[in-house]
Amino acid sequence: TLADYIDSKVEGKAQDTDQLREVANIEKAMDYIEQIMTPGALLTEQTIRELHAMTVHDLVREGDKTPGAYRSGAVRISQSDHLPPDFIQVQAYMQELVDFVNRDDSPKYDLMKVALAHHRFGWIHPFGNGNGRVVRLLTYALLMKYGFNVSTGGRVLNPTAVFCNDREHYYAMLATADHGTTVGLEEWGTYV
């Protein structure tokens, strides 16, 4: 838990459990985002892959056999009816996503772009494991890229972790957006 992680840092204990390493990995990835992601910075596929590698580093249960590499087979998403695209299509979809978030649009669309990118990444599900953690980090990075002040007052954890407060509702809203309709995507955008 977060409390255990904070205790381990304060008391100088070794981070010897998967759960503590998972929180430490997320903290490291957030530090990385805060170093590289400034307003207007380009987001690259390499950055996303690096976030994945950091997130799953040295994890047993929640790790990935190929940190930082796109998946090489089919995956299923727990608690979802969505079947992600074939792994052969992942590279092209990820390039399309990166092109979309880096496109020079009016700032009035920035929050909508964050919402759409969050959904699209989840829809693609590019990695074998760790996609949920990476999409929340990606969302954090995009908020910084678009100039939203998300680190005021210090941070304890990723502000996009609020998506986990009601996972059932989160998954239901993702499923609504999965239909690809204007109405479904608008409902998702309003939710985010």
How would you describe each model-predicted region?
Residues 1-192:
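FIC/Doc superfamily catalytic core
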